[in-house]
A protein has these predicted regions:
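N-terminal, membrane-interfacial amphipathic/helix-forming hydrophobic leader that caps
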Residues: 1-73, 78-79, 162-163, 219-233
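Hydrophobic membrane-targeting signal helices
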Residues: 20, 57, 61, 95-98, ...
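Alpha-helical transmembrane segments of multipass membrane proteins
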Residues: 15-17, 48-52, 87-95, 194, ...
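N-terminal start-of-chain detector that recognizes signal peptides
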Residues: 29-31, 40-43, 105-111, 144, ...
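Transmembrane helix-loop-helix hairpins at the membrane interface
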Residues: 8-19, 114-233
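Short helix-terminus and kink motifs of transmembrane alpha helices
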Residues: 18-26, 96-104, 148, 152
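Juxtamembrane helix-loop-helix connectors linking adjacent transmembrane helices
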Residues: 32-39, 61-137, 156-157, 227-233
Length: 233
């Protein structure tokens, strides 16, 4: 594997998880963020993800990975659109009911999720559209990084396909280490599902829709079920 690919995997496996946990510690040490602070957080995260995508795409294409290998080409357009929309609706519904369940629970995990929601999820109208832009960015950029580049790079080595799916899911879970152990497990399992779907469809498009849909629902259902109604406006 080329040296620059190793650097990218170092970014995915070490730098991004460390950065996420460090940012979360700083956020949790502060009182709940105001609208301006949330908008700055959303904008900085959007910028970071698009810069990461551009840098990784530059090195991937420069090293000979093709758009097809990266999941950027597809032949069955109708099937992919239907799969994307149906999957987004199904996973979004699951996210909705899971957050409703968490909102009724007590204990360390629900309390951590409430603190996280209080600081990063939109609670006012002015915050919602920028949050949706962040959700779409995460859907596009993270799917390219983990199901596009990482799977393509590993598949060019002697790593078996089943292990490629597990390794990239593990990296995806670590990227969400700021959510705690349950967050790592949940996103890791979602990463396995997305990795298998990537193999089935040969395209990132369905997973991008699924990922964005799950995050958008989190921005709607999270404040509704995890925070008191008085905090939303």
């Amino acid at each position: 594997m080329p040296w620059d690919f190793w650097l990218i995997f170092l970014l995915l496996g070490v730098v991004i998880p460390w950065r996420g946990r460090a940012r979360l510690r700083r956020l949790l040490a502060k009182p709940p963020l105001g609208s301006l602070e949330k908008l700055v957080l959303y904008a900085s995260t959007i910028a970071f993800q698009w810069i990461a995508l551009a840098a990784v795409a530059w090195r991937a294409l420069g090293r000979g990975l093709t758009p097809a290998e990266l999941g950027l080409e597809h032949q069955r357009t109708g099937e992919i659109i239907v799969a994307g929309l149906v999957g987004a609706a199904a996973l979004g519904s699951f996210q909705w009911f899971n957050l409703r369940r968490l909102g009724r629970m007590t204990g360390p995990t629900p309390e951590r999720m409430r603190k996280l929601a209080e600081r990063i999820l939109p609670t006012k109208t002015v915050e919602r559209l920028p949050y949706c832009a962040l959700a779409v960015t995460a859907g596009v950029c993270e799917e390219f990084l983990y199901r596009g580049f990482a799977m393509a790079a590993l598949q060019r080595t002697a790593v078996p396909v089943w292990l490629v799916v597990i390794l990239t899911a593990a990296l995806f879970g670590l990227a969400h280490a700021y959510q705690g152990r349950s967050g790592i497990m949940a996103t890791g399992l979602m990463g396995i599902l997305f990795g298998l779907a990537r193999l089935v469809f040969g395209s990132l498009a369905p997973m991008m829709l699924w990922h964005a849909g799950v995050d958008i629902v989190a921005g709607i259902a999270g404040p509704r079920f995890l925070l008191s109604t008085g905090e939303c406006a």
